[in-house]
C-alpha cells in the first residue's frame, strides 16, 4: 500500500434527526431535520473539534438537511464569515444516505436553495438528484459504486484535511464494510457510527490504484 495523496479525512455522522427516534412511522418524514438533542450533540462536537484543534481546510457535506444543519453547528468555527479559519464547502450528492425511505430522500433543489442560499448546490443539478435512481439508487451494488466515486471526489479536491459530513449506512460503504445481506434501510446500531461521532482516516491509494480509507494512526 502506498499513500501519495497525503489527505486526512474526518468522517462525521450527522446529529440525531427526527427519524432516529420515535416510531417507525418517522421514517416517512421527508428529509428530516435535527432534534433538540441532535442540536446539542452538534454543539458538543463543535467544542470537541476546537479543543482537539482539528486542522480542517475543506468541508464536504451531503445535501440533506440533517447533514447541512450538523455542518453549520458543529463546524461553525471553520465557517466563520470573513474569519481566518474559513474553509471552502463542497455540497455533493455522492455523500447522501442510501435507502429509499422518505427520510433518506432529499428535498428538491429549489427548496434547498431557499433554505440554504449561501451554499452552492450546482453538483446536485445532475438531472437525477433527489431521485433514488441511477448512481443514487437504493441498491447495495450501486451504492458501492457510488462510494468509490465519492472517494475519487475526495482525492481530486485540492484540500488535504477534509471533514466529511454524511450518514451512517453510507459511511459503511465508504469504509467497505457493508455486506450484501445487510438491510440498508435499517442498519443495526452495532454496525453504525453514533450520531455526531467522528473518526479520523487517511485516504490512501493501494499499489493496484484502489482508494481506501484507513484509520489514522493519529486518531
UniProtKB/Swiss-Prot annotation:
Keywords, in A-Z order: Hydrolase
SUPFAM superfamilies: Phosphoglycerate mutase-like
GO MF, one annotated term: phosphatase activity
GO cellular component: cytoplasm; cytosol; nucleus
EC number: 3.1.3.-
CDD domains according to UniProt: HP_PGM_like
Residues forming the catalytic site: 14, 167
Keyword tRNA processing: no
InterPro entries: His_Pase_superF_clade-1, His_PPase_superfam, PG/BPGM_mutase_AS, PGM_Phosphatase
Sequence similarity: Belongs to the phosphoglycerate mutase family. BPG-dependent PGAM subfamily.
Protein name according to UniProt: Probable phosphatase SPAC5H10.03
Organism field: Schizosaccharomyces pombe (strain 972 / ATCC 24843)
Amino acid at each position: 500500500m502506498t499513500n501519495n495523496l497525503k489527505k486526512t479525512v474526518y468522517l462525521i455522522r450527522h446529529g440525531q434527526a427526527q427519524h432516529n427516534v420515535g416510531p417507525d412511522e418517522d421514517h416517512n418524514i421527508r428529509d428530516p431535520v435535527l432534534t433538540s438533542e441532535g442540536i446539542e450533540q452538534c454543539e458538543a462536537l463543535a467544542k470537541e473539534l476546537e479543543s482537539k484543534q482539528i486542522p480542517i481546510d475543506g468541508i464536504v457535506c451531503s445535501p440533506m438537511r440533517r447533514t447541512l444543519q450538523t455542518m453549520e453547528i458543529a463546524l461553525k468555527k471553520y465557517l466563520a464569515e470573513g474569519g481566518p479559519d474559513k474553509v471552502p464547502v463542497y455540497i455533493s450528492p455522492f455523500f447522501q444516505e442510501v435507502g429509499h425511505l422518505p427520510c433518506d430522500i432529499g428535498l428538491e433543489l429549489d427548496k434547498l436553495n431557499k433554505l440554504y442560499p449561501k451554499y452552492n448546490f450546482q453538483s446536485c443539478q445532475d438531472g437525477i438528484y433527489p431521485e433514488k435512481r441511477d448512481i443514487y439508487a437504493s441498491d447495495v451494488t450501486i451504492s458501492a459504486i457510488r462510494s468509490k466515486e465519492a472517494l475519487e471526489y475526495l482525492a481530486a479536491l485540492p484540500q488535504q484535511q477534509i471533514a466529511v459530513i454524511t450518514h451512517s449506512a453510507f459511511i459503511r460503504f465508504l469504509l467497505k464494510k457493508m455486506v450484501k445481506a445487510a438491510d440498508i434501510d435499517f442498519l443495526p446500531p452495532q454496525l453504525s457510527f453514533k450520531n455526531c461521532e467522528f473518526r479520523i482516516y487517511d485516504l490512501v491509494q493501494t499499489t493496484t490504484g484502489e482508494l481506501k480509507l484507513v484509520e489514522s494512526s493519529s486518531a
